[in-house]
């Protein structure tokens, strides 16, 4: 009920609601962080865990608990509806009872399969701070942060981050078994002799060509469109909308992109940089932000370019497939041309995809009547 009351609502300073909802969010993330500390072998991402400073994470958690508690009290004072403050303080109490920011971590063996709870927490905090700020400073359209459908997209965001370990495990095993025969040491050494920056450009290009091909299949083959339609069903574009994706499509795309990367043997640091760029660009290109790229919009994929891909306007159907380099669409004749700067409407023509994460995961599997 607390989340339902938020949808499409305009939040105004001075009402106490903003403080209440921020308090609940920070308290919930802090509690999840405590659980991740308790069960790191099952709830944290090995690669991410190796990169961050644990003491810094503890400090962030402590600050989050302080801010959450303070805003929860403010909610009690300023808002006639005390529910948010009560929920926040309940979550804070549980988090502290479980050890709070000082929770101890015992020695452990990493599980082969894990839930990316730490990845969800850190990415949600970072993306919210960066992209909500961008959308409010230079918005394309005036719309609420908690616009209609945000709950569905947040569910997708949560699940996609949580299952990252299982998806990567499945993709790695499939690719190594299916394409191990194609690995050739001489070819890998040739690629690794390129400069670091040249490898980065090459991996982006190779990955985008694979994604372009898969993306066209998702659109032009009816069976695959039923899965991909989930991603296109968002009628409002912002940084969170890009998370809306069917698990089957997510896994297939990961396998497709990983295959040439595995075969060509790029340097690990190049792959790490590629992953960062992919994550950032995927979110940026869905943002509700009026960012001017000038002539670069013909080279790289921009929010404007990708918004056209999500448009339900007739001129935009099955266009702008590329994920990184817009020139791929111009070369293959699938770029939107001669249109005004931004599309008018988004979503699936006919609006036949149901709302809700569970319904959307089940939708492609339903037999047409």
Predicted features, each with a name:
Residues 6-29, 56-57, 80-82:
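N-terminal membrane topogenic signal
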Residues 141, 147, 152-345:
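Membrane-embedded catalytic scaffold of the fatty acid hydroxylase/desaturase
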């Amino acid at each position: 009920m607390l989340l339902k009351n938020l949808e499409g609502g305009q939040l105004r300073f001075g009402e106490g609601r903003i403080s209440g909802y921020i308090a609940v969010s920070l308290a919930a993330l802090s509690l999840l962080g405590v659980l991740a500390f308790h069960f790191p072998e099952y709830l944290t991402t090995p690669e991410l865990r190796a990169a961050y400073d644990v003491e810094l994470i503890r400090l962030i958690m402590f600050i989050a608990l302080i801010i959450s508690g303070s805003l929860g009290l403010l909610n009690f004072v300023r808002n006639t509806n005390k529910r948010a403050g009560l929920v926040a303080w309940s979550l804070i109490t549980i988090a502290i009872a479980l050890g709070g920011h000082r929770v101890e971590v015992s020695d452990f063996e990493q599980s082969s399969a894990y839930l990316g709870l730490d990845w969800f927490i850190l990415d949600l905090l970072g993306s919210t701070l960066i992209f909500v700020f961008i959308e409010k400073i230079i918005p394309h359209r005036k719309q609420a942060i908690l616009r209609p459908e945000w709950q569905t997209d947040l569910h997708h965001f949560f699940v996609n981050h949580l299952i990252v370990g299982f998806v990567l495990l499945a993709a790695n095993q499939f690719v190594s078994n299916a394409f191990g025969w194609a690995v050739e040491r001489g070819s890998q050494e040739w690629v690794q002799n390129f400069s670091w920056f040249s490898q980065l450009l090459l991996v982006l290009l190779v990955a985008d060509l694979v994604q372009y091909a898969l993306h066209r299949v998702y659109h032009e083959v009816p069976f695959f469109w039923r899965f991909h339609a989930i991603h296109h069903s968002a009628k409002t574009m912002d940084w969170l909308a890009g998370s809306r994706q069917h698990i089957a499509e997510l896994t297939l795309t990961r396998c497709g992109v990983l295959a040439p990367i595995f075969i060509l043997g790029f340097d690990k640091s190049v792959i790490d940089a590629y992953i960062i760029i992919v994550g950032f660009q995927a979110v940026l290109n869905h943002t509700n932000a009026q960012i001017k790229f000038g002539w670069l919009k013909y080279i790289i994929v921009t929010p404007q370019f990708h918004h056209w891909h999500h448009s339900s306007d007739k001129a935009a159907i099955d266009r702008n497939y590329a994920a990184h380099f817009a020139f791929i669409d111009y070369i293959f004749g699938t770029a939107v041309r001669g249109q005004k700067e931004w599309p008018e409407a988004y979503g699936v023509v006919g609006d036949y995809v149901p709302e809700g994460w569970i319904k959307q995961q089940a939708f492609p599997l339903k037999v047409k009547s």
